[in-house]
Amino acid sequence: MPPKTPDRRNAAMQSLRALVGVVLIWGHPVASFGAEVRETEGNLIFYSTSNTADTKAVTDSFKRLYPKVDVQFERTTDSQLMEKILNEARAGKPRWDVVSTTGYYGYLLKKRGLLAAYDSPERKHFRAGFKDPQAFWTSTYTTYAVFGYNTKTVPTSAVPRSHEDLLKPAWKGQVGIEGRGYEWFTATISGMGREKGVSYMRALAAQNPGLRIGRTLLAQLVAAGEFNGTLTAYIHNFDALKNAGAPVDWVALPPSFANLHPVALNAKAPHPNLGKLFIDFMLSQKGQEVVRSLKRIPDRIDTPPDPPNLIQGIIPAFTAPEVYDNFERYIKLFQEIFGVH
């Protein structure tokens, strides 16, 4: 091979510098390499069930890193989003590239073959239980159901430390429950063990809890004193009220229902490479810091929540796949136990 001329050496060095520069972009060698190629694909379509403000914050942060990418998002409820995705699939015209939803609907999308496996290099920073073993989804943040209570009506000495404490006579008629809290119900039963869990739910129903629709509403009713406490609202529901001066606080009763929020790639994504790049961002430390800034609890192990000890000691309860396989049966069991018609 003939020796390289100075011009050829300079060209080689410039190529090397360019490659190194690409690799160093926000510390992400795989996602950053080839980003220019991916940016030429066009629009990225993101379907989300998070609220509009949170979804916009995430997509805006991504666009600041990749200004050539036009990200369009559509936000709706879990059930409406599922119907939309299924209708598109039946018509053979899927529009979306990436979806962010909750655990049960992520499971359904995978089961119906609508997701593509994508083992993002960022997934190594997520614990088992927070990512699909076959790489079809990874959870970006988790909402934990805790027991929130009114600090004016519940003295410190009476704050429950276990689920069983709520079976005491003093709590009869004083607890609010989400009227469609099916995943809380199934995950708690899974966490306790089926026999013990179902027995507990029947005993809890005998305490005459008040059923309401909406976790935010339940937290507000606790703050107003309509209930002394509620089992099914999330940490952020109570922290928002507490920070606004409401007389509420919360405690985690093990096991605590962990509501995952998986992000996944469409099996027939119009722009699969852009979709992968967006997922890489959402799972990256930078993306997870955006999640944290929205007062959510990131699932990435090196991105602690704010404050860092927020979920210290919480024992998460996930809904087992075999439970999802029989989810309709558990819905009927919930309705039977709590008298929902």
What are these model-derived regions, one by one?
Residues 34-45, 64, 168-172:
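Immediate post-signal peptide segment of exported/extracytoplasmic ligand-binding proteins
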Residues 45-57, 72-82, 94-226:
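Extracytoplasmic ligand-binding site segments that recognize negatively charged/polar headgroups
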Residues 105-108, 228-247:
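A ligand-binding cleft/hinge motif common to bilobed small-molecule-binding domains
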Residues 115-122, 136-138, 242-257, 266-268, ...:
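Short beta-strand->loop
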Residues 128, 143, 171-180, 202-205, 209-212, 281-304, ...:
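Periplasmic-binding protein-like
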Residues 146-153, 189-191, 259-274, 290-291:
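A bilobed periplasmic-binding-protein/Venus flytrap-type ligand-binding module shared by bacterial periplasmic
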Residues 197, 299-341:
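An extracytoplasmic/periplasmic, membrane-proximal ligand-sensing/linker region
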